[in-house]
Every structure is written in C-alpha cells, then in structure tokens.
Regions:
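All-alpha prenyltransferase/terpene-synthase fold signal
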Residues: 1-294
Length: 294
C-alpha cells in the first residue's frame, strides 16, 4: 500500500533540497547528505496519507511543501537532540556534532528552523500557524522534561507519557492534521486526523522504547539499552523498577556501565516487562484506529 507514496516522498526530498539551498556550499552539501542518509519518513507518509481526506490533486503543491516543512522540523530537532545528548551516531550514521562540532551542528539546526518559519509564512491558514506554534513550543518543553528527568527515580508513568507526548506525538499529530487542513478536508476529518496522529505517535514512541531493549543493535543501528545508558528512564525501565526496585538502588549519574548493563539484561530478558510495554502501546494504537472510525 505504501509503495504508491514512494514517488511523492521523493518529490518531498527534492523540494527540501530546493527550499534549504543557500549560498554556502558546505551547508548545502551537509544538508543534502543528511537528508539523503535514509530514514522511515514516517511523518511525511502520514501527512501524505491524511491529505487524501480532502482534495489532494488541487492542493498537491502546498501538500508537498508542508510535508517538507514537517520533515525539516523533525530533522532539526534530531540535530539539536544529538548535540544535547553528545551523541556520536544516529541509526548507524555519524552525527553532525561528532563530525563537524557542536557549533556547526547547532547552526545547521537553527538554519533549518529558520527555513521552516520562512516557508510556513506562505500559508494563509491561521490553524496551520497555531498548530505549528504549539508544536514547536511542546518540542522544546519535551526536551527540557527529558533533561530534567535523567536518572530521576521519582519518574512516574504519567511523567513518561507527558514527555513522549511532547517529544514525539505532538509532531506526528501536526503532520496528520496539517495534511488534512491543507487538502481542504471537512472539520470533523481534520479533528479526527489530529487525534489519530497523537495516539499513533504515542504508540510509535512506546514501540521505539520497547525496541531499545527487545530489538537488535544491527536492526536499530544503535546499541541495546542506549536510552538507559544515557540515563533516560523509558517505559520498560519504569515497569522494571516497579517489579524490582532494588535493581535501581545505584541508578544515578555516577553509576558505571557494568551496573547499567545488569539492568539492561534484566529488562531485555524479562518477557513480562516487554509484553506489558507492548500492551500499553497497543492501547494507544487502538485509540488511533478508533479515531479514524469516528
């Protein structure tokens, strides 16, 4: 089914190269290499799919442009995340901050966000502007919440859900709702598309956190348990702490890697923890499906 969107996704990538082009050739090359490195393009696909709720053909140019904007937001936020996390690789590729330094990477991220603001100003729809402003604000708050929550054993499930809402779900919701708005979809379909994107985004992030323990390093392009190594307490770790609090007695900023690996092994080999994580993800996926049914 998704094969039919391959050509449209390619059009989005080509559009990104056009609107991000600058007088600085190094910047152009870096951006082209970064966007060409692959990726699932989940947000682009979801925007394109939801744009079918209205008149896609008569709004194709604006839909492609909004898909470009969404992908640029996602990419810029990843670049800034990598700087904050001091990450050296992302999905098997070297990060910009590792290759070129924090200053250059920060400027690339800022440049991309400036492109977003320039391009979205061409859209007259006030709801697009409102949704975008809220999305960017929530992305920043989500990053602050994650930073404050590192190694925090007082983190509750509710705290985790609030964090992933801001870090992941809110941008996916913006992708789905902007696709439906720009295509001229009916109000009830616009509202449904936002709920669909939000719940799907929650499910998506929980699955990603599940795969951080259950997936393989080769398939994910990163080491197993990397979030926990970085002090980030995700849902599988929260469930593990509820089941075995003693395991986390030494979990603080001074804990060594060996002790972290003990926790990681406990989680990845505990079927109950992984199954409960999947179950919670499925609940959000069910809500996403029900949003469409409505």
């Amino acid at each position: 089914m998704l094969k039919q969107y391959d050509e449209l996704v390619q059009e989005v990538l080509e559009d990104i190269f056009v609107i991000t082009k600058s007088e600085d050739e190094k910047l152009n090359q870096v951006i082209k290499k970064y966007f060409s490195a692959g990726g699932k393009r989940v947000r682009v696909l979801l925007l394109l799919i939801c744009s079918k709720l209205g008149d896609f053909n008569n709004n194709k140019k604006n839909i492609i442009r909004m898909a470009s904007i969404v992908e640029i937001i996602h990419t810029a936020s990843l670049i800034h995340d990598d700087i904050i996390d001091k990450a050296e690789t992302r999905r098997g590729n070297i990060t910009l901050n590792k290759e070129f330094g924090d200053e250059f990477a920060l400027l690339v991220g800022d440049y991309l966000f400036s492109i977003v603001l320039r391009e979205v100003s061409e859209f007259e729809n006030e709801f697009i502007h409102s949704y975008l402003a809220t999305t960017l604000k929530e992305l920043c708050i989500g990053e602050l919440i994650q930073e404050d929550g590192l190694y925090n054993l007082n983190t509750r499930r509710l705290d985790y859900l609030r964090k992933i809402k801001r870090k992941t779900a809110i941008l996916i919701a913006f992708a789905t709702v902007s696709g439906s708005i720009i295509s001229g979809a009916k109000k009830e379909d616009v509202d449904s598309s936002y709920r669909f994107g939000y719940y799907l985004g929650m499910s998506y992030q929980i699955i990603d956190d599940y795969l951080d323990f259950a997936g393989g390093a080769t398939s994910l392009g990163k080491e197993i348990g990397q979030d926990l190594v970085n002090g980030n307490i995700t849902l599988p770790a929260l469930i593990a702490k509820e089941k075995n609090e003693n395991l986390f007695l030494d979990f603080n900023r001074s804990i060594n890697l060996e002790k972290k690996n003990v926790i990681i092994d406990y989680i990845k080999n505990n079927k109950d923890i992984l199954d409960e994580t999947l179950s919670i993800s499925q609940r959000y996926l069910d809500k996403a499906e029900n949003s469409i049914a409505e």
